[in-house]
């Protein structure tokens, strides 16, 4: 079992020459490889895409076997992938998924980091995060619009919709957290983001998500102060330990206008640098003494939350951004760790009630012009949404593609299927140079159960009911998605979430159009269904408006 191979450099093929037997198998092949592109993955030589140890394949032997299997797979066969390892090929039918993926799922009694890490060390499991092991990660862009929408809503609720001259403090510039600086600037606020790894800061600078950096707190604060006074938002990365820096700001009485965090706190061994440790010590001890790392990291997380609570008490809008930091602190004795809310119940849930979430697509041609054309098609088909148009304009101007050109665009029920069918027609008539794939984050309205994040504080108390993502995966399979995934532990760690993903290929065929129409209607409809069942009036109204047949919910 080879987990680390510095000699490997992976990039997705581009153009129209097939390496597999059809676009239905070429697409997962390219997207798997794209997940490990050096400009996409955090540690590609270790197969780590993002989020601590979120991998694309269990080991390099499994990666090679997946690639070879996809190349020979027929269009009436389905490949089964178990925690990043290809385990079977079975005869199904042309409208069945070409790949079915299950990653890091454990029986609830054993669904904890200790048991998972034991399996992981034996080579029996793989942590797939959300889009790492489901082969639809598109770099930091994948989370940037959701982060932008959150910051815009924070500005609307707390500052009358204007973040000019305001600044956000946060931690973490990894694959998810790296979206925060650009999202803040897009929303009109400056951002001070603390990151312990210089390599992560360098990647955000290289890909355009961060404006500048320093290793000196006073210099960082000077840069933030200058940008706020000028009314020109700027993002500053600070090399350091976020728990130390936030405590120092509280001690000095320096108050940010907004406060959150996106360190990989969900994984106390691999995701959070303990206070007083160097990164080199941490990297060594993660292997040699993981229990010592976990103990020290958890203590630091508790201090981190205490500082956040201090600012919350001072009136600073403070929000958990879904990394389970509050839970870790609660388990370390911080009884009021949940005094400030998570971002979904505070800012995003009304969108989920209408099935609106992180719709994304990637151009298999590798040509950025294909994304420009699809951006224009979105504007054409959704002409009366200036907020969406502004997002697309900003994305085109400010977001650098990582790996295959891609776009993230939050749209909901009734729009996703229209866009998918339009993209398929653009492939059919030659407007696009090659097929596109359409997928989404597992962070969506109907595809996740995560009581400390997406399903926190549900109106009916159904936060932990995980039937919904299972039904979502089953329905997407029945509807004809090209690949479907069912994961455990993404975002918030082992024992705290179950979630499902889907990807569908627009190859320009009539058969694809039928699948697209089913999948891209049914997938967001499950989100409306889930929230209607929980009693949200917005979702109930949406379900009635769209004519959903929900017999046990609408009567």
Curated annotation (Swiss-Prot):
It is found in: Cytoplasm. GO terms for biological process: L-histidine catabolic process to glutamate and formamide; L-histidine catabolic process to glutamate and formate. It catalyses: 4-imidazolone-5-propanoate = trans-urocanate + H2O. Belongs to the urocanase family. NAD(+) binds at residues 51-52, 129, 175-177, 195, 262-266, 272-273, 321, 491. The active site is at residue 409. Its main location: cytoplasm. PROSITE patterns: UROCANASE. Its cofactor is NAD(+). Its EC number is 4.2.1.49. Pfam families: Urocanase (PF01175), Urocanase_C (PF17392), Urocanase_N (PF17391). The gene is hutU. This is Urocanate hydratase. Binds 1 NAD(+) per subunit. Catalyzes the conversion of urocanate to 4-imidazolone-5-propionate. Pathway: Amino-acid degradation; L-histidine degradation into L-glutamate; N-formimidoyl-L-glutamate from L-histidine: step 2/3. Keywords: Cytoplasm, Histidine metabolism, Lyase, NAD. One of its GO terms (molecular function) is urocanate hydratase activity. GO terms for cellular component: cytoplasm. It comes from the Bacteria. It comes from Stenotrophomonas maltophilia (strain K279a). The keyword Lyase applies. InterPro entries: Urocanase, Urocanase-like, Urocanase_C, Urocanase_central_sf, Urocanase_CS, Urocanase_N, Urocanase_Rossmann-like, Urocanase_sf.
């Amino acid at each position: 079992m080879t987990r680390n191979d510095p000699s490997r450099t992976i990039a997705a093929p581009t153009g129209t020459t097939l390496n597999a037997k059809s676009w239905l198998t070429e697409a997962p092949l390219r997207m798997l490889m794209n997940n490990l592109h050096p400009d996409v993955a955090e540690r590609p030589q270790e197969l780590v895409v993002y989020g601590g140890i979120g991998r694309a394949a269990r080991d390099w032997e499994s990666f090679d076997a997946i690639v070879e299997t996809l190349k020979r797979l027929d269009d009436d066969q389905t490949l089964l992938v178990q925690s990043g390892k290809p385990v079977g090929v079975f005869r199904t039918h042309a409208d069945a998924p070409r790949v079915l993926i299950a990653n890091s799922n454990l029986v609830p009694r054993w669904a904890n980091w200790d048991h998972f890490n034991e399996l992981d060390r034996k080579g029996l499991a793989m942590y797939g995060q959300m889009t790492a092991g489901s082969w639809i990660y598109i770099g930091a862009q994948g989370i940037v619009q959701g982060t932008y929408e959150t910051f815009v809503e924070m500005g609307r609720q707390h500052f009358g919709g204007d973040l000019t001259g305001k600044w956000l403090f946060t931690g973490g510039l990894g694959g998810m957290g790296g979206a925060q600086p650009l999202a803040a600037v897009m929303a009109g606020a400056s951002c001070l983001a603390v990151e312990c790894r210089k390599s992560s800061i360098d990647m955000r600078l290289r890909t355009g998500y961060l404006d500048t950096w320093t290793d000196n707190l006073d210099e960082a604060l000077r840069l933030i102060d200058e940008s706020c006074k000028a009314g020109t938002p700027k993002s500053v990365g600070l090399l350091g330990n976020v728990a130390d820096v936030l405590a120092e700001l509280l001690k000095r009485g320096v108050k940010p206008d907004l406060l959150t965090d996106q360190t990989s706190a969900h994984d106390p061994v691999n995701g959070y640098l303990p206070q007083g440790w160097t990164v080199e010590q941490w990297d060594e001890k993660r292997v040699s003494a993981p229990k010592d790392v976990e103990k020290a990291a958890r203590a630091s997380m508790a201090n981190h939350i205490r500082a956040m609570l201090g600012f919350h008490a001072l009136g600073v809008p403070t929000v958990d951004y879904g990394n389970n930091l509050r839970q870790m602190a609660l388990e370390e004795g911080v009884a009021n760790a949940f005094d400030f809310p998570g971002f979904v119940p505070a800012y995003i849930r009304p969108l989920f009630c209408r099935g609106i979430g992180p719709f994304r697509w990637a151009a298999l041609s590798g040509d950025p012009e294909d994304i420009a054309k699809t951006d224009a098609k979105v504007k054409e088909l959704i002409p009366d949404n200036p907020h969406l148009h502004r997002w697309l304009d900003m994305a085109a101007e400010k977001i650098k593609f990582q790996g295959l050109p891609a776009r993230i665009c939050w749209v909901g029920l009734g729009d996703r299927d229209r866009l998918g069918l339009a993209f398929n027609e653009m492939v059919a008539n030659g407007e696009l140079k090659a097929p596109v794939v359409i997928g989404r984050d597992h962070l969506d309205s109907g595809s996740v159960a995560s009581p400390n994040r997406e399903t926190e504080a549900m109106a009916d108390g159904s936060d932990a009911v995980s039937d919904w993502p299972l039904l979502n995966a089953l329905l997407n399979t029945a509807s004809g998605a090209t690949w479907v995934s069912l994961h455990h532990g993404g975002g918030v760690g082992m024992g705290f979430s179950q979630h499902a993903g889907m990807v569908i290929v627009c190859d320009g065929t009539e058969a694809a159009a039928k699948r697209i129409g089913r999948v891209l209607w049914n997938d967001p409809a499950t989100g409306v269904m889930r929230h209607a069942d929980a009693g949200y009036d917005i979702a109930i109204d949406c379900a009635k408006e769209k004519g959903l047949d929900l017999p046990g919910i609408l009567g």
